[in-house]
Amino acid sequence: MGRSIFINGVSGISAQTEEAIFNNEPLVYNSNIFNAVPANYKEVIPAMALRRMSKAIKMGITTAKNALLEANINVPDAIITATGEGCKQDTEKFLETVLEQKEELLTPTSFIQSTHNTVGGQIALNLNCTGYNITYSQEDISLESAFIDAMLLLEADLDINAVLVGSVDEVSPKITSFSYLNTSEGAFFFVLSAEKKINSKVEIVAISTFKEKDVLNISVEIQQFLNSNNYTISDLDIVLLGKNGDLNQDVVYNHLAKELFSTSCILGYKHLAGDFNTVTGFAMWLTCKIFKNNHIPNVLKLNTNSCQNPKLGLLYNLSQDNTTHSLILLRKI
């Protein structure tokens, strides 16, 4: 891609707050489900509308509008949303109603609000945005797919000045409890532009996804990704690994940490935010905050390598089925 892509606004809601992380006092959870810390939704959404919204919609609209506010944008030219599992709470409501009413006299509200593109549609309605609007749902690379689409859109259409890109996933009482993983929820939105502005803080250098099972070939893919963007492993200041405690995944993460990133400052984040399909949104939000604050909290560090002024960060994540990999390269401006 020829044009530089900049992040001009960022907002996130997750199981941790910015203050908790950067004060090295993270919130502690005693169950395998980490619930997102609620934002002050009433500041962004009218009370009457708020009562009818699920958590996913509340989080999505709030983070989207806060990111736009930071970027000084009223209405974006396009909205691209990512979700791994959609609006699970409304899905549960609809399925329970189907069973309780024996498939008769069903109201459409829960069904309509359970579809994966609900959040993107609600954001567009709230902002009165009639531009390009699409939702990606590719499990663990949903957000990466959304970002790649946004970058292609900014590359192809010079009339597009601001693209709102983000992700939303939520937990639900029944469906989520089926899993024994440390799972969580969150919403993260970013305002992208091909034009560098005063409030531009981070550049998205490149994003890539690939499939590979052999750990040695994974290392080769990562090095080729960096080389294609005129960087090497030694250029990396911080590396964020999506390590989640899964023993099968640890084989890959531990190999990369020891053999490939041994000189870099390696950070983890899933021990704080849990793991879910679009958790890379938390990693991107966190990297933007590290660049902004010029500080790496000790609670994130997975090794003893230090970095006083991080300017280049690589985010690596492995899908829950251990087959799909994502790479996101971010540079501080």
Language-model regions: role of each:
Residues 1-132, 137-144, 152-156, 166-333:
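Conserved "HGTGT" condensation-loop signature of ketosynthase/thiolase-family condensing enzymes
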Residues 147:
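Short, conserved alpha-helix that lines the donor NDP-sugar binding/gating region
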